[in-house]
């Protein structure tokens, strides 16, 4: 990790301020180099490209000093940035061990440095797309399952690095509420069966836009989604900004969705968490 920090110039950035570094072990770095077919770290950097290599390394660093006791499960901003220069987030799950993006586990915690804390990792932690940031959060497993079962290969769509998205993501409880309100439906799979996979695709796309929409730029008004209105256009929802940010869908039978945690940044856009499933009918 020390060599990688020097190669990217991040060692200079870490010399001023307090930081938390999730550091893959030397064995992890060696396995990474070998798995990708390179001779050494220099060859890996050249093969990936300087910017991508730096982004991966910076994705292991948080600003501020955080011991393992300081963490709770949630999204954390890293020092990596995407093409829009927004700081990327990772998802940390705090259980018996700390897990980053459901893959990289902390195997030795709380190594105290002069200007922060180091936590040792058992694997490389890669930046995630807007889909990837939902995929790794167990509180959004219903949305993740719906994306996987819908027509149109939405997983690949929302992971596409050549595109930009904003995803308004309802949590599991929101899907549970929709299940309860849908006649003759008892669980998520029955809900999906009642909708059909084509309608499910449009339902998911009603929660996404094809542009970067950070909370600082949200205004009261209509927003075009990626959902098809059946006439060659796109369905819209309405944002109402007051004491809360509310999203009003096209159904009279559902409650407004309230915007919760916002500006969770992925490699290809942003995620905002909401508390209701939006219906575009």
Q: Predicted segments — roles?
A:
Residues 1-281:
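Mature, structured domains of secreted/extracytosolic soluble proteins
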């Amino acid at each position: 990790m020390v060599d990688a920090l020097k190669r990217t110039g991040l060692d200079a950035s870490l010399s001023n301020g307090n930081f938390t570094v999730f550091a893959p072990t030397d064995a992890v770095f060696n396995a990474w180099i070998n798995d990708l077919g390179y001779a050494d770290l220099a060859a890996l950097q050249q093969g990936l490209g300087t910017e991508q290599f730096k982004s991966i390394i910076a994705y292991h660093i948080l600003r501020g000093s955080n011991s393992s006791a300081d963490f709770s499960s949630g999204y954390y901003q890293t020092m990596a940035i995407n093409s829009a220069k927004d700081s990327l987030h990772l998802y940390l799950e705090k259980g018996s061990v700390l897990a980053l993006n459901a893959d990289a586990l902390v195997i030795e915690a709380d190594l105290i440095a002069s200007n922060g804390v180091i936590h040792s990792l058992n694997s490389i932690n890669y930046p995630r797309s807007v889909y990837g940031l939902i995929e790794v959060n167990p509180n959004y497993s219903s949305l993740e399952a719906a994306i996987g079962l819908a027509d149109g290969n939405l997983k690949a769509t929302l992971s596409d690095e050549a595109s930009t998205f904003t995803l308004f993501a309802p949590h599991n409880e929101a899907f549970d509420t929709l299940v309860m309100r849908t006649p003759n439906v008892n669980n998520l799979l029955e809900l999906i069966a009642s909708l059909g996979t084509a309608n499910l695709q449009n339902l998911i796309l009603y929660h996404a836009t094809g542009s970067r929409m950070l909370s600082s730029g949200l205004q009261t008004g209509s927003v075009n989604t990626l959902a098809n209105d059946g006439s060659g256009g796109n369905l819209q929802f309405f944002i109402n900004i007051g004491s809360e940010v509310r999203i009003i869908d096209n159904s009279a039978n559902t409650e407004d969705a309230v915007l919760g945690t916002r500006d969770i940044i992925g490699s290809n856009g942003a995620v905002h968490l909401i508390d209701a499933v939006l219906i575009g009918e």
